[in-house]
A protein has these predicted regions:
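N-terminal export/assembly segments and adjacent metallocofactor-ligating motifs
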Residues: 1-145, 154-155, 159, 163-164, ...
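Short, surface-exposed, charge-dense and proline/glycine-enriched linear segments
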Residues: 3-6, 105-111, 215-220, 281-294
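Broad hydrophobic/π-residue packing in well-ordered secondary structure
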Residues: 24, 31-35, 53-57, 77, ...
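Non-catalytic alpha/beta scaffold blocks inside enzyme catalytic domains
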Residues: 90-93, 97-273
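Long, low-complexity segments enriched in small/aliphatic residues
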Residues: 259-295
Length: 295
């Protein structure tokens, strides 16, 4: 659970979930609240000829679609921090429909231990909430070495759907690796890559996003939105859907996390038979099949 006051996050506290963690929450998770209120990008921006100016969402997405249409070999960096619905939207619209090369970087830091509801210790070096969601969608998961080579060896425009998808992306080296290419980044805070990007989009935080996530144990859980998006920020699923419309792969229709989840459950075997309504009222549902436990 997320405690907030006057639109600012104050603390994280554990939600009682007898099937997953009981009342317990790790200290690492508790202290993620620090810095959660940082917001340096709240409107779409366009940079050209040394100038930065505010643009509309329509204008920003049309620019990105144009980058992908007129230049060969566009690259896309997705994120294991995104919801299942966002990752499904990426797979269907950017990989399957547009034929883009997409990777999902996973940061394997120090091994962390967390006790589950049955008193068993779970060890993992995966610092992301939804690496398994990416794998289940069939999106390629890469480590930092492959992420670096993916960006350095590419020569097409780049779309980064989470400026903090991997710690390396927040470094000056990452910005230098793509300095000669058109780049668009979805972000909340400034990094060297964000500050040099051709287009910057304000992304909603996960506390401002509704959706589902697949744990390292293969349990799909629903997360409610705690706060409204700040400024003009939008969640990743909404950004990808809107971009797909500009690329001609989606028609104007009502879309929401619930709608996307239903379509995902119909098309992705691991989620078959699940419903959004049940996930909103139950502590979680196991996927069909095995999960890749990172450790």
């Amino acid at each position: 659970l997320l405690g907030h006051l006057n639109g600012e996050v104050q603390r994280f506290v554990p939600r009682f979930n007898p099937e997953v963690n009981g009342w317990w929450m790790c200290d690492y998770g508790r202290f993620l609240a620090e810095g959660f209120n940082d917001r340096e990008v709240d409107v779409p921006l366009r940079r050209s000829e040394g100038r930065t100016r505010k643009v509309t969402w329509h204008g920003a997405l049309e620019t990105i679609a144009g980058m992908m249409r007129v230049t060969a070999n566009p690259l896309v960096v997705a994120s294991a921090n995104l919801s299942n619905e966002a990752l499904f939207c990426i797979k269907r619209n950017l990989v399957d429909a547009e034929g883009l090369d997409v990777v999902v970087p996973v940061h394997r830091g120090e091994v962390r231990r967390i006790k589950n509801a049955h008193g068993q210790w779970i060890e993992s070096a995966d610092a992301h909430p939804n690496s398994n969601g990416a794998r289940l969608m069939g999106l390629p998961v890469v480590d930092v070495a492959n992420l670096e080579s993916y960006l350095r060896d590419g020569d097409g425009p780049l779309l980064v759907l989470d400026a903090h998808a991997h710690p390396w992306l927040a470094t000056a080296d990452a910005a230098a690796a793509v300095a000669q290419r058109s780049t668009a980044v979805l972000a909340r805070t400034a990094t060297p890559l964000v500050e040099s990007a051709s287009v910057v989009l304000p992304g909603a935080s996960w506390a401002e996003t509704e959706g589902t996530y697949t744990s390292s144990e293969g349990i799909v859980q629903h997360a409610r939105r705690a706060l409204p998006p700040t400024g003009q920020s939008q969640p990743a699923w909404q950004v990808v859907y809107a971009l797909a419309r500009h690329l001609g792969h989606e028609q104007e229709r009502h879309v929401s996390p619930r709608v996307l989840f239903a379509e995902m459950a119909a098309e992705t075997a691991a989620f078959a038979g699940m419903t959004y309504g049940r996930l909103m009222s139950e502590p979680g549902m196991p996927i069909h099949g095995e999960v890749d436990r990172v450790g």
